[in-house]
Amino acid sequence: MSQASALRAPTPQALPPMAREQALRPDVNEAHVRFIGLGKTYPGQAQPALQGIDLNIRHGEIFGIIGRSGAGKSSLLRTINRLEQPSQGRVLIDQVDIAPFNEDQLVALRRRIGMIFQHFNLMSAKTVWQNVELPLKVAGVAKAERQRKVRELLELVGLQEKHHVYPAQLSGGQKQRVGIARALVHTPEILLCDEATSALDPETTASILELLRDINQRLGLTIVLITHEMAVIRDICHRVVVLERGAVVEQGEVWRVFGSPRHEVTRTLLAPLQAKLPAALQASLQAHPASGNSAVVLKLTVLGEPELSALFNDLGGRVRLLQGGVETIGEHALGQLILSVQHSPHDTHQLLERARRWAEDVEVLGHVD
């Protein structure tokens, strides 16, 4: 049996009755996880941790949740496997409301939802093999089946040669790979990642992201992750939601949100990823034109690589490219251009309208002489 077939999602017969029909006809555009009017207030706290969350997470996508500290990211993530019980609203998994689940149903649900953590949560007195095998032993899985599953999972995460060692002998990245293998032992449909790369160096983070991407593609898992590292969202996620004080303030495809953030919170979170203006330009920027010879400085976010000569001709006047670059997010190339426009025949309003013909987003940075 191949790894992919051995680790594929549970058969419809293993799902709750209401979800079986959905599983027989999965649609990547249908909601795998759906939040409806979700709210959460902790005892003794006046400010809700979550409020009015309406959100869909699609089958097979990698979905990111970002926000400032205390925005409600972990609270939202933990409602998916009901480690947190909402105060209001509903959480639906494959169109099934999980709120009324009893203990047996919750056990079955949590076996369908794997979870990995920032600090690995491995048992130091057990080997790599034993750490991965433990949930299967607790579930009463036969020894032969346990051995087969653990062997396949350790091969999947690239640790088959480390099966006999203890966590203290592993690097941080290797420990997280053990955590990922353990999270997959019950062949889940959903994988929750709670700051899974925050304790890792950049090189190790990249390798873990590549592993998660491979698992997503090969096994068809829906992956939901929270992180404070915006580069992680950019590099791996298909869509993203931004939370602030427990509410959704922005959501969409990653390339659109990162290329043209609309909300102030989103712009603040993404600021470290933005190319910095040259120091000389930053120092010379003024809020208003100082004279008739002043040039307006524009930042344009464009899809693909525009024909600069045609863009400059459309803007009119004397146009200078002060800074530019292109990066790829997902399958989309996004360019960022910093231009100064002097003596344009168009007033500022007309100039911005013309710039928007070419750009996903246009921002006036200021004026320079």
Curated annotation (Swiss-Prot):
The keyword Transport is annotated on this UniProt entry: yes
InterPro entries: AAA+_ATPase, ABC_transporter-like_ATP-bd, ABC_transporter-like_CS, ACT-like_dom_sf, MetN_ABC, MetN_ABC_transporter-like, NIL_domain, P-loop_NTPase
Entry's EC annotation: 7.4.2.11
Gene3D superfamilies named among the record's database cross-references: 3.30.70.260, P-loop containing nucleotide triphosphate hydrolases
Compartments where located: Cell inner membrane
Location (main, coarse): membrane
Domain ABC transporter span(s) in chain numbering: 33-270
Entry keyword annotation includes Cell membrane: yes
GO molecular function: ABC-type D-methionine transporter activity; ATP binding; ATP hydrolysis activity
Catalytic reaction(s) noted: L-methionine(out) + ATP + H2O = L-methionine(in) + ADP + phosphate + H(+); D-methionine(out) + ATP + H2O = D-methionine(in) + ADP + phosphate + H(+)
Enzyme class: translocase
Membrane topology classification: Peripheral membrane protein
Top-level division of the source organism's lineage: Bacteria
Protein keywords: Amino-acid transport, ATP-binding, Cell inner membrane, Cell membrane, Membrane, Nucleotide-binding, Translocase, Transport
Residues forming coiled coils: none
Sites where the protein binds ATP: G67, R68, S69, G70, A71, G72, K73, S74
One cellular-component annotation, GO: plasma membrane
SMART domains linked: AAA (SM00382), NIL (SM00930)
Family: Belongs to the ABC transporter superfamily. Methionine importer (TC 3.A.1.24) family.
Subunit structure: The complex is composed of two ATP-binding proteins (MetN), two transmembrane proteins (MetI) and a solute-binding protein (MetQ).
Function: Part of the ABC transporter complex MetNIQ involved in methionine import. Responsible for energy coupling to the transport system.
Name this protein carries in UniProt: Methionine import ATP-binding protein MetN 2
Organism, as annotated: Pseudomonas putida (strain ATCC 47054 / DSM 6125 / CFBP 8728 / NCIMB 11950 / KT2440)
Name of the gene encoding the protein in the UniProt record: metN2
